[in-house]
Amino acid sequence: MFKWLLKHRSKPTPLELGIFDQKVSFWKPFLLFCPALLTTFLFTLVPFFLTLQKGFSHNEDIYRVDSQQFGFQTFANLFSESNFILGLRNSFLYSIISLPLTIVLAIIISSAIVFVYRKLARGFWQTVFFLPYVTSGVAVSIAFIYILDSSSGILNNIFHVNIKWLDSGERDTFNALWGILIFGIWKNMAFNVLVISTAMLSVDPTLYKVANLDGAKPIRQFFKITLPSIRPTLIFLLTLLILGGMQVFPISLFNGNDSEAVTNGGSTILLYIFQKIRDQNNNFAGAATLVLFILGVCYGLVLRNGFRLIEWAQWKIKRHYVQTKLNLV
């Protein structure tokens, strides 16, 4: 019986390859990739090329359909429009001012949350600061309309001032821009706090233990351990804030009335594009879209290369300091 069992025992099955090691024909993964490829082509590439075509064409005669010519005349006319210049000013200043304020405030709040040692309290504060992100945008806009109201607004009552934030009636005023900044920073704070606090909590605690043994103070640990460890997260958030800053669309603060936004100095590039598309002036809308795209790309490149330049300068300074110490020894 024992010999029979040995003879008929099950043979070991050969080791199977993992799913990433198996040879698969080309068409199977390509078919899975086709929906995403088709969506990107239809809703990204095609609109982009149509925008290029509209932006670089202008009508010599508005009464003739076949009078469109290729050139830069639309861009020249675009920069001569006061509404576009106003929107360009507000969009640029919003992105320049809101970016550092949002990042710095989010880092400070996230640091406070991380240093709360009780897990229950930590999760509670994360939830509190994330609530604005999941709150209805309409409800938030209505709340800020009442907060920024010139006659009975909470902000004016707290500081005992009478600033017309959203209803000054002046095109060149900066009051509307400050109101848009307050609204935008508060709205973007929730997501940034959640992401940065999660990144801080994922830093290896061994690094802090070693730093404590070396006598490093908490502030030094923050700048030498925490910030370098969450650098990829900060770069990701900077990219999102750059795109969001240039594409600010504050029409909800003006009760959905774009003309009221322009009249009170609250116009932006995206609001200008919205007006031109509604008026079926696609050439100006396409040119403004290309200007917005170029500004966003240039702004992002300047910031990213600027951070790399700062890091390189810090490395050179530290290297020079170490070499000086070694030479003294």
Swiss-Prot record:
<dbReference type="Pfam" id="PF00528">
    <property type="entry name" value="BPD_transp_1"/>
</dbReference>
<keyword id="KW-1003">Cell membrane</keyword>
<feature type="transmembrane region" description="Helical">
    <location>
        <begin position="30"/>
        <end position="50"/>
    </location>
</feature>
<keyword id="KW-0813">Transport</keyword>
<keyword id="KW-1133">Transmembrane helix</keyword>
<feature type="transmembrane region" description="Helical">
    <location>
        <begin position="96"/>
        <end position="116"/>
    </location>
</feature>
<keyword id="KW-0812">Transmembrane</keyword>
<dbReference type="InterPro" id="IPR051393">
    <property type="entry name" value="ABC_transporter_permease"/>
</dbReference>
<comment type="similarity">
    <text>Belongs to the binding-protein-dependent transport system permease family. MalFG subfamily.</text>
</comment>
<dbReference type="InterPro" id="IPR035906">
    <property type="entry name" value="MetI-like_sf"/>
</dbReference>
<feature type="domain" description="ABC transmembrane type-1">
    <location>
        <begin position="88"/>
        <end position="303"/>
    </location>
</feature>
<feature type="transmembrane region" description="Helical">
    <location>
        <begin position="176"/>
        <end position="196"/>
    </location>
</feature>
<keyword id="KW-0472">Membrane</keyword>
<dbReference type="GO" id="GO:0055085">
    <property type="term" value="P:transmembrane transport"/>
</dbReference>
<dbReference type="GO" id="GO:0005886">
    <property type="term" value="C:plasma membrane"/>
</dbReference>
<comment type="function">
    <text>Probably part of a binding-protein-dependent transport system. Probably responsible for the translocation of the substrate across the membrane.</text>
</comment>
<feature type="transmembrane region" description="Helical">
    <location>
        <begin position="234"/>
        <end position="254"/>
    </location>
</feature>
<feature type="transmembrane region" description="Helical">
    <location>
        <begin position="128"/>
        <end position="148"/>
    </location>
</feature>
<dbReference type="InterPro" id="IPR000515">
    <property type="entry name" value="MetI-like"/>
</dbReference>
<feature type="transmembrane region" description="Helical">
    <location>
        <begin position="283"/>
        <end position="303"/>
    </location>
</feature>
<protein>
    <recommendedName>
        <fullName>Probable ABC transporter permease protein MG188 homolog</fullName>
    </recommendedName>
</protein>
